[in-house]
Every structure is written in C-alpha cells, then in structure tokens.
Amino acid sequence: MTTANPGDRLGLLGRKVGMMRIFTDDGDAVPVTVLDVSNNRVTQVKTVETDGYSAIQVTFGARKASRVTKPEAGHLAKAGVEAGEILREFAVSAEVAAEYKPGGTLPVGLFAAGQKVDVQGTSIGKGFTGTIKRHNFGSQRASHGNSRSHNVPGSISMAQDPGRVFPGKKMSGHRGDVTKTTQNLDIVRVDEARQLLLVRGAVPGAKNGFVTVRPAVKVKAKKGAN
C-alpha cells in the first residue's frame, strides 16, 4: 500500500445528487453516486511565509449576502468571490499552491476516470437508538428468568473500584450525523460539461448533503509491483 504525497491531495467540494446505475460496454450494471462539484472557487492561498503551511482554501455553493458575517464577507470580498455554503481548505505542497490564485476556480478535470478517491460527508442521522442497533450488541435471553431486560446493555461499570463509568463506554445515544470518510472509491465517469463526478458505490450522507472529494490517501499497490 502506498501513501499519496500531501501536494497531491488537492480535491473538490460538492453536493451529493443521488445514486443511479450506468452500464458498461459489456452490459454490466454499475451502481454510482452522482456528485455535483461545479464552481469551486479559491478564496485564499496559504503559504509557509505568511501562514506557516501551504494550503488552498475553497468554497462551494451560493449563499445570500445577508447570511454572511462581516468578517467572512470581507475575507471573500478580498478574494473577489461569491459567498459559498461551505468553506474548506486542502493542505498542498508549495509547488501546487503556487499554481493557484484567489478568485480562480478548480475544474472537475482535477480527477480522471479510473482514479481512486476518498469521499467525506456527514452520515444520515438516525436519532436516539439503543446499544443493539448503535453498537451491534446482542440481546439478553428471551425467557428463563429474564424480566423486562431483553434489550438492555447490561452492567456499565464496577462497584467501589473504580466506582465510575469509563469515558467512551458504549451506551445508548444519538446514532449517525457524524463525519465519515469512505476510502478508495473508483471514479467511473467525469462529466466535464455538467461538472459531475460519477463514483462507484455509496458515499456518506443524504441527498443534497455536502461532500469533500480527495485523491485516495491509501492507494493499494498492484500485485507484483515493487
């Protein structure tokens, strides 16, 4: 397994349109997720001299001017770009950062068909759930002395020593609505005319949810390669 260079991790922001299937020339059906990555605007280029590290800050989407704070409005006005719905930055090498300027755009051509990518999004919220659904616990006995304790997790701590519940104990609670990353997804098709990426398989989040697409950080080396 090889690891991508930091300078090769420049990606795109987008929105999950939904899922569909396409057919190959051989007639095979391929499930894909359609990602809209249009109009990625560069809001800031960070350098080692001014910021201590190299990065490219990008915004996606459109937002009303009345919904933008004054500090953010001034920051975007300096770059000469329209306010977006999300703002992210990608750590890159100094050489890559030098290729971009504030006010420019990132094309969908950053990615190519057959390339491996990591897609990050916010998973669908499931509300309050128990330990069986949330943590894959097993239930208690259905009968033989069990009374009203069929789906309880059981003991959560010990008695006098240590006398407390350890942090991170798996218990009931809110499930989903967290940042998730699905790695090593194949790009099946790049639609430059409509600024769309068709990625094989599912990606985190609901329809119209925001996603971040980056080149895969864990690229599996082909068998037989040195």
Curated annotation (Swiss-Prot):
GO terms for biological process: translation. The keyword DNA-binding does not apply. GO terms for molecular function: rRNA binding; structural constituent of ribosome. Residues 137-158 have a biased composition (Polar residues). InterPro entries: Ribosomal_uL3 (IPR000597), Ribosomal_uL3_bac/org-type (IPR019927), Ribosomal_uL3_CS (IPR019926), Transl_B-barrel_sf (IPR009000). Residues 136-162 are annotated as: Disordered. Keywords: Methylation, Ribonucleoprotein, Ribosomal protein, RNA-binding, rRNA-binding. Belongs to the universal ribosomal protein uL3 family. One of the primary rRNA binding proteins, it binds directly near the 3'-end of the 23S rRNA, where it nucleates assembly of the 50S subunit. Part of the 50S ribosomal subunit. Forms a cluster with proteins L14 and L19. This is Large ribosomal subunit protein uL3.
